[in-house]
């Protein structure tokens, strides 16, 4: 990112970062879609230099692609990182972010308030590969620190926990991580960099499902990893040899020497993306770039509508409880006001009076809301987490995540608020 780009405001960066000037090959103002598998080297020395990480440039679209690179540069600028890696899905982003520094025999400390797929990844898939996880209540900082072991490689949490949008004390988690010379990895999907930039509060690595608010229209899958460039990998070389010592999978390169402050994200691209192939397609990157151009406008409307829905539900006689950070008390409310002064959390849950059958019937009765397993679309969405997104969790895990049989998750869209409220009301009428 140029110095000039760095001086721009968020709303300008979301449109221009990564492509300050027209396409140099065609003079196209819009970002071109480079649908090519590979790139021609002008000579053998250029080819060798690119493979040896001594000369920048494209090799193969599994690793880099001009369209994807613009998306990565734009996201890095918006999050305030030194570099980013676009991948096929949010799940791929989480997996690569963790496996980049943690392997068999290592340990993770993770928040319990996570997307069900992430919980399953940590509890089962990574566990089967020899990587263990201790889950802790994210609000209990003493428990977070107590869970750290000699083989712990990272702390992991979501800035707004899925599905209740519980607010993370990022600075508290970061202080604990850095006290023990560990990086803090956070999922910023529900917040977006427009509402919160975790790197400014101490996060070392940020991941997100770009499928959600970044794309914003439910049309393209994607994930992204952002490197803050601040963690001292070289100073902790024994703990993170893959980043800070000769890497045998890349002919002995030391990524902290070859890439400097971007060592972490360079290793992720050069090894894990190379080997696992969870590549973001240029077409999807183009769609996600289209979404980024209106991110701030959409998020403002999402939040505005959501807060009105929260007020509506909080006074509704058929609602047992609304789980939204604006209604929290004590330290939780302090964190919400501190990190989200303009509001947040258009994805949240409420508990309907009745049974699980009541909750499911309510989701089926809505007409404007779509019953589907996605969030952060311009369209309003609804789902019953206990039987869908979090159905693979045990009863104990559901309780720890704040999910009951009557919990309903809403993702509030950008439609007219009168229409949103009217649809919710007719849903309640259907289950009276």
Residue ranges and their predicted role:
Residues 43-92, 117-125:
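Conserved N-terminal alpha-helix of the aminotransferase class I/II PLP-enzyme fold
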Residues 19, 35-41, 212, 229-230, ...:
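Glycine-rich beta-alpha junction loops
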Residues 276-279, 283-285, 290-294, 299-301, ...:
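Conserved small-domain helix->loop->beta segment predominantly found in fold-type I
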Residues 2-65, 73-74:
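N-terminal "arm"/small-domain region of PLP-dependent enzymes with the aminotransferase-like
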Residues 2-5, 18-22, 84-315:
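Conserved PLP-enzyme active-site core in the AAT-like
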Residues 155, 223-225, 322, 348, ...:
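Well-ordered beta-strand positions enriched in small/hydrophobic/aromatic, beta-favoring residues
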Residues 2, 11, 123, 132, ...:
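PLP-dependent enzyme catalytic core of the Aspartate aminotransferase-like
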